[in-house]
UniProtKB/Swiss-Prot annotation:
Membrane-topology annotation of the record: Multi-pass membrane protein
Organism: Chromobacterium violaceum (strain ATCC 12472 / DSM 30191 / JCM 1249 / CCUG 213 / NBRC 12614 / NCIMB 9131 / NCTC 9757 / MK)
UniProt keyword terms in alphabetical order: Cell membrane, Membrane, Transmembrane, Transmembrane helix
NCBIfam families: YeiH family putative sulfate export transporter
Name of the protein described by the UniProt record: UPF0324 membrane protein CV_0763
Gene Ontology cellular component list: plasma membrane
Pfam family, one: Cons_hypoth698
InterPro entries with a match to the protein in the record: UPF0324_pro (IPR018383), UPF0324_YeiH-like (IPR004630)
Transmembrane segments: 7-25, 35-57, 88-110, 125-147, 154-176, 218-240, 253-275, 290-307, 314-336
Family of the protein in this entry: Belongs to the UPF0324 family.
Localization: Cell membrane
Domain of life: Bacteria
Entry annotated with the keyword Transmembrane: yes
């Protein structure tokens, strides 16, 4: 009983930050900026963590750690209720292929540039690459337990998602206005936005800026990228196990991220449309709360001084990936459209 009682202060603090972030994310000003509850939760957590948290750090430690680890995994699993496999059919094979090519090329470019050219550490490169190539802050959060990454590196990766994802959200609609006279449809724009923008909330805003139809296509394409998170984490876990075996005959056991497998199972279950709409909305609201609490807890344990020490290289890597998402993402979209139509 004492063990569970020790969780209460930190859990209450994490959930309080999450509740405030969810409320703030619904404000018109925040919606217009495409700032999700996850982003606001980590910002709020960092503000508290670098000011008054030290006064309650000791009694809150266990609950904050629980939020970062257990609530995070539960949140990723429940995230599957936002998806159905029918979503894939809505954009067809071309949407899936575009997402797969953008994800793979962006992550491989991140690894090559980050490690070979910028000399960044492996954890930072993988976290930034995952955030840019898959689904922003949620991907960074989900990758953290597989890597056992440091909180400061996670916070830096999330910061790059916020900076460049927000830039994309404003820039993509402007780019479309400049090229729509070339006959590029709103459906094609939606595919491009969904396959290249970092966060789901940012994809919603970028699509809505053009039309409701573009927004629907962007969101579905984006959610297919989210669905690719599970196989990515399993592949990453297998690669890390093989790498850390050091080439010895006895391979290190693959630490399968079961929460990622459960995420896919939940998405599969959700595809049968068995749950009432009202219950599904309640589950999704709970999921938002759990993920925001995990982000708030992460912010509480992130020190600004450590982020400063990371220097400019993480931003340089993220900016290069941003450029690739514009140019490379555009070429991939155009190439697949030409190939399949």
């Amino acid at each position: 009983m004492t063990k569970y009682r020790n969780l209460i202060p930190g859990l209450a603090l994490s959930l309080g930050l999450a509740g405030a972030a969810i409320w703030a994310a619904e404000l018109p000003a925040m919606k217009s900026l495409g700032l999700s509850a996850l982003t606001l939760a980590i910002v709020g957590g960092m503000i508290v963590g670098n000011t008054v948290y030290r006064f309650v750090a000791e009694p809150s430690h266990h609950g904050v750690t629980f939020s970062k680890q257990k609530l995070l995994r539960a949140g990723i699993i429940l995230f599957g209720f936002k998806l159905t496999f029918q979503d894939i059919a809505a954009v067809g094979f071309s949407g899936v292929l575009i997402d797969a090519l953008v994800l793979t090329s962006t992550f491989l470019l991140a690894f090559w540039l980050g490690r070979k050219k910028l000399g960044l550490d492996e954890q930072s490169v993988i976290l930034i690459g995952a955030g840019s190539s898959i689904c922003g802050a949620a991907a960074v959060l989900a990758t953290e337990p597989v890597l056992k990454a440091h909180a400061e590196k996670v916070a830096v990766a999330v910061a790059t998602v916020v900076v460049f994802g927000t830039a994309a959200m404003f820039l993509w609609p402007l780019m479309y206005q400049g090229v729509r006279h070339l006959g590029i449809s709103e459906f094609s724009y939606g595919l491009f936005a969904g396959s290249t923008i970092h966060e789901v909330a940012q994809a919603v805003a970028a699509g809505k800026s053009v039309s409701d139809a573009a927004m629907n296509t962007a969101v579905i394409t984006k959610m297919i990228r989210v669905m690719m998170l599970a196989p990515f984490l399993i592949a990453l876990s297998a690669w890390l196990a093989n790498k850390h075996s050091g080439g010895h005959q006895k391979k290190q056991a693959i630490a399968i991220p079961w929460f990622a497998v459960a995420f896919l199972v939940v998405a599969g279950f959700n595809s049968f449309d068995l749950l009432p709409r009202a219950l599904l909305q309640q589950i999704i609201s709970l999921d938002n709360l759990l993920l925001a609490a995990a982000m708030g807890a992460l912010g509480l344990t992130t020190h600004i001084s450590a982020i400063r020490q990371a220097g400019a290289k993480p931003l340089l890597l993220a900016s290069a990936l941003f450029g690739w998402l514009i140019v490379g993402g555009g070429l991939i979209n155009a190439g697949v459209a030409t190939l399949l139509h």
